[in-house]
Amino acid sequence: MKHKVKHIHFVGIGGSGMSGIAEVMLNLGYKISGSDIHDSVTTRRLKKLGATVYIGHARTHVESADAVVTSTAILPDNPEVLAARESKVPVVPRAIMLAELLRLRQGIAIAGTHGKTTTTSLITSVLAEAGMDPTFVIGGRLEAAGSHAKLGRGEFIVVEADESDASFLHLQPVLAVVTNIDADHMDTYEHDFGKLKQAFVDFVQHLPFYGMAVLCVDDAHVLEIMPAITKPVTTYGLSETAQVRAADIRHSEGQMHFTALIGVNGKTRKLKIVLNLPGLHNVQNALAAIAVCNEVGLPDVSIVRALADFKGVDRRFQRYGEIPLTDPETGRNGSFTLIDDYGHHPVEMAATIAAARGAFPGRRLVLAFQPHRYTRTRDLFEDFVKVLSTADVLLLTEVYSAGEAPIIAADSKSLARSLRVLGKVEPIFVERVDELEEAIHSIARDKDVVLVMGAGSVGGVAPTLSRDSQVEARLLVSPKENREPAVLLLQGS
């Protein structure tokens, strides 16, 4: 019956989860159309690949569609969704479409509150290095591939498993990774952490009898669910109890060096690893990839090469290079290194700040942060205050609502007041995101680290800052001048 579906329409096609599935379906030969409220790099890429993309939503966009795909970000009263239902065109949740893709290959699904995108990308990179040509659907753009997704010819498909709306329960992979479990998206689970943990148990229990769960034993909540899991398990982490663990860990020039100890059948195999990412959290992500690829049976040389050559993921500690600081009025000069990151949960932010401190020791850390969602700010308010107070300088802009209504005392000004009471850092409130670039230039000094974090519109700050600085440099900076680099870090989960 599947042959009757030829044209698939994606409502919100520019989203990170939707665009990847759309690209794979396009590569499979389906006619793909979609709509989004904004033009973007992603929508333009899909157009070049042959998709029809509309900016804005209208009933006419779905007139010839055989199926319409939506995500939980799309409201039920969306005109395209309403038109599809009235015409009896199937409206398919994104997760179910992803589950259909998993049926075509052997699925490797990565779940967890933090680290999904990087871990998925690392596993994909090792499979590719080993010549396995995997299909992948990732929440961020894999720099080596220049895309969120790719249809490979190999037997494996590697995907992120999204717990935010419990949609990962539709997936039935043969290998399931759980990186960690933390309090986030709690509205989905009726603010019951027990229900969130049970969802992860149910996700793992969907494995076939010949499948394997790969679990991080560094995480207390993962340890708590392990007794309820009846499927085969491989453990990884920094803990000495892990079957795949790391020893002799050290930072060096933005990379992590360690020895991977792989326990198999009572014997331990050692791999010398250079990971082209900073931070202990990325060592954990790499260990997950090593555990999965060891289970698949990939050669050690592919693991070592892929981790050393890893090009990174869009907005995950993404480095934009040296940004000049030139101000003719004050005579200020020098430069900083610009890094963009997607982190927006306090745990992720703490890990990335620690990675920045480790990669660039002794430098002043300027944090520019846009909170994401009023509900998250409310639920994790004290955790945000704690992690934001670890910056040396803090630029704080208003919450990115993601469609939510404002919540009293869950906005950025409330965060700023609490931070002032704590007294560890004096927050500088920047009303609008488009004013952050000027604020950064006014506050940054030579050899600073400026970390800008957030999952919302703050994602446009780093590329704009980099582009504008390059233009300025051509106009104002003599190529003969010798300036030492500093560090600017933009972070967002």
Curated annotation (Swiss-Prot):
Show the GO MF annotations: ATP binding; UDP-N-acetylmuramate-L-alanine ligase activity
Q: What disulfide bonds does the UniProt entry report for this chain?
A: none
Which InterPro entries does the record match to this protein? Mur-like_cat_sf (IPR036565), Mur_ligase_C (IPR004101), Mur_ligase_C_dom_sf (IPR036615), Mur_ligase_cen (IPR013221), Mur_ligase_N (IPR000713), MurCDEF_pg_biosynth (IPR050061), UDP-N-AcMur_Ala_ligase_MurC (IPR005758)
Q: Which reaction does it catalyse?
A: UDP-N-acetyl-alpha-D-muramate + L-alanine + ATP = UDP-N-acetyl-alpha-D-muramoyl-L-alanine + ADP + phosphate + H(+)
Identify the main location.
Answer: cytoplasm
Record key words, sorted: ATP-binding, Cell cycle, Cell division, Cell shape, Cell wall biogenesis/degradation, Cytoplasm, Ligase, Nucleotide-binding, Peptidoglycan synthesis
Highest rank taxon of the organism: Bacteria
Q: In which pathway does it act?
A: Cell wall biogenesis; peptidoglycan biosynthesis
The biological process GO terms on file are: cell division; cell wall organization; peptidoglycan biosynthetic process; regulation of cell shape
Q: Name one Pfam family in it.
A: Mur_ligase
Q: What is its EC number?
A: 6.3.2.8
Where it sits in the cell: the answer is: Cytoplasm
4Fe-4S as a keyword? Answer: no
What are the binding positions for ATP in this chain? G112, T113, H114, G115, K116, T117, T118
Which Gene Ontology CC terms are recorded? cytoplasm
Role according to the record? Cell wall formation.
What NCBIfam families does UniProt report for this protein, alphabetically?
Answer: murC
Record-linked PANTHER family? UDP-N-ACETYLMURAMATE--L-ALANINE LIGASE (PTHR43445:SF3), UDP-N-ACETYLMURAMATE--L-ALANINE LIGASE-RELATED (PTHR43445)
User: HAMAP family attached here?
Assistant: MurC (MF_00046)
Sequence similarity: Belongs to the MurCDEF family.
Instruction: List the protein's name.
Output: UDP-N-acetylmuramate--L-alanine ligase
Q: Give the organism the record lists.
A: Nitrosospira multiformis (strain ATCC 25196 / NCIMB 11849 / C 71)
